[in-house]
């Protein structure tokens, strides 16, 4: 494991750290170290690596696109969708990465602010003999986002976005929330003040924050931090020679990873 904290090199995404000693513009307190949840997990070599879930409310279905760590002939994926303990839909199919699987949901209940209904999703990977290789618990929300003219629509209905600008800073920990309750409390306070969501400003938020947003019906705009490229260095009084190709490549890979990680959260309605 190699970690490089290169704030001034111009090739590493900065978050929103200032390249100067003091905060300036939209660049704030510098931070270092591991600032989000990190863990080691033993996984099955033939288990489920990830699964994208695409809701389609117009056809009343959830579309699953699984990906596996490796493929073995005879392995099968079992998907079960339930609501309040009642099974809504299920299927079984040979394991194959990247192949969409459609599951029709009877009498679908939509996810929306005020009524954030979530479906429980259970995955199993079994070999040809029926042995359980992997088991994953997840959830999904049925919702649709689109724009008509200058209006935003959620589930085919116009919604006014009354959003706060959430910086994701904490008195204790700077970028790191002291506890799960602190993440939840930010959403609760915003909703009590009459807001229905937040623009998550220049920060890839903790996954647990998105979990609470999903559970509480809180709309969010996911946003990538400062690219770290030196477009405005002279105005900030810092002079750097920047490899823009390397910088853009780093930004592109980091941004793709962030979107991929948070793709399934129904509370995220836009990326900026």
Predicted regions and their residues:
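Secreted/periplasmic carbohydrate-active enzymes, especially glycoside hydrolases
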Residues: 1-212, 216-217, 254, 269-270
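Catalytic cores of large soluble enzymes that bind and process phosphate-bearing ligands
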Residues: 26, 30, 243, 247-250, ...
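Active-site-adjacent "subsite" loops/lids of carbohydrate-active enzymes
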Residues: 161-162, 229-255
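Short glycine/proline-centered loop/turn elements that form peptide/ligand docking sites
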Residues: 208, 224-231
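Hydrophobic residues in well-ordered beta-strands that form the structural core
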Residues: 220-222
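Active-site groove signature of glycoside hydrolases
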Residues: 254-272
């Amino acid at each position: 494991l190699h970690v490089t904290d290169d704030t001034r090199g111009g090739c590493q995404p900065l978050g929103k750290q200032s390249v100067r000693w003091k905060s300036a513009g939209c660049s704030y307190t510098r931070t270092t170290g591991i600032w989000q949840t990190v863990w080691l997990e033993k996984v099955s070599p033939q288990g489920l690596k990830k699964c994208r879930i695409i809701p389609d409310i117009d056809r009343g279905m959830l579309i699953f696109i699984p990906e596996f760590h490796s493929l073995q002939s005879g392995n099968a994926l079992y998907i079960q969708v339930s609501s309040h303990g009642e099974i809504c839909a299920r299927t079984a199919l040979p394991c194959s990465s990247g192949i969409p699987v459609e599951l029709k949901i009877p009498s679908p209940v939509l996810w929306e602010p005020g009524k954030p209904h979530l479906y429980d999703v259970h995955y199993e990977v079994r070999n040809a003999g029926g042995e359980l290789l992997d088991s994953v618990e997840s959830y999904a929300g049925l919702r649709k986002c689109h724009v008509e003219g200058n209006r935003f629509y959620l589930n085919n209905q116009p919604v006014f976005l009354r959003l706060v600008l959430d910086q994701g800073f904490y008195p204790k920990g700077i970028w790191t929330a002291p506890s799960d309750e602190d993440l939840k409390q930010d959403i609760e306070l915003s909703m009590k003040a009459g807001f229905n969501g937040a623009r998550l400003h220049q920060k890839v938020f903790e996954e647990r924050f998105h979990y609470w947003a999903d559970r509480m019906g809180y709309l969010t705009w996911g946003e990538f931090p400062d690219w770290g490229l030196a477009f405005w260095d002279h105005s900030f009084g810092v002079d750097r020679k920047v490899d823009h190709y390397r910088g853009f490549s780093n930004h592109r890979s980091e941004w793709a990873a962030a979107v991929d990680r948070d793709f399934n959260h129904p509370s995220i309605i836009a990326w900026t």
